[in-house]
From Swiss-Prot:
Entry keywords, A to Z: Amidation, Cleavage on pair of basic residues, Neuropeptide, Pyrrolidone carboxylic acid, Secreted, Signal
Species per Swiss-Prot/TrEMBL record: Drosophila melanogaster
Assigned GO CC terms: extracellular region; extracellular space
Gene name for this UniProt entry: Crz
Annotated region described as Disordered, given as residue ranges: 91-119
Chain positions with Pyrrolidone carboxylic acid modification: 20
InterPro entries cross-referenced by the UniProt entry: Procorazonin (IPR020190)
Tissue: From late embryo to larva, expression is consistently detected in three neuronal groups: dorso-lateral neurons (DL), dorso-medial neurons (DM), and neurons in the ventral nerve cord (vCrz). Both the vCrz and DM groups die via programmed cell death during metamorphosis, whereas the DL neurons persist to adulthood. In adults, expression is seen in a cluster of six to eight neurons per lobe in the pars lateralis (DLP), in numerous neuronal cells in the optic lobes, and in a novel group of four abdominal ganglionic neurons present only in males (ms-aCrz).
Source species taxonomy: Eukaryota, Metazoa, Ecdysozoa, Arthropoda, Hexapoda
The protein's name in its UniProt record: Pro-corazonin
């Protein structure tokens, strides 16, 4: 008689354990869909008691501050790029080759990769000569159009 009572109890316990293991192995947790989907930690079910402890507001505040910091960084970058490229009274053509970049009137408009080891002209001694030869070949092949700004007009 005892075996008849223990066998269903044992099978019920075994099925509950297997079901629970299956749920957690697939990422299913109790109340997973009830949390706020805005914060990724809560959506993954890592902080079950976050609403009880008041941590949802903390995570929303951290997301807001990082977004605000990113917006501020991007706006500063945009302002610096605009200020660099839109200098009043400067006649700067991006397609024009600067004849003497070392004695340029606007050193910040010239190529400033001299201190960078990867892009320094010491690593590529014939860089300027090769680009000038290519420009001459292109202008000779193009005939009358020796202007380097041919593609900018279209």
């Amino acid at each position: 008689m005892l075996r008849l009572l223990l066998l269903p109890l044992f099978l019920f316990t075994l099925s509950m354990c297997m079901g629970q293991t299956f749920q957690y192995s697939r990422g299913w947790t109790n109340g997973k869909r009830s949390f706020n989907a805005a914060s990724p930690l809560l959506a993954n079910g890592h902080l079950h008691r976050a609403s009880e402890l008041g941590l949802t507001d903390l995570y929303d505040l951290q997301d807001w501050s990082s977004d605000r910091r990113l917006e501020r960084c991007l706006s500063q970058l945009q302002r610096s790029l605009i200020a660099r490229n839109c200098v009043p009274g400067s006649d700067f053509n991006a397609n024009r080759v600067d004849p003497d970049p070392e004695n340029s009137a606007h050193p910040r408009l010239s190529n400033s990769n001299g201190e960078n080891v990867l892009y320094s002209s010491a690593n590529i001694p014939n860089r300027h000569r090769q680009s000038n030869e290519l420009l001459e070949e292109l202008s000779a092949a193009g005939g009358a159009s020796a202007e380097p700004n041919v593609f900018g007009k279209h």
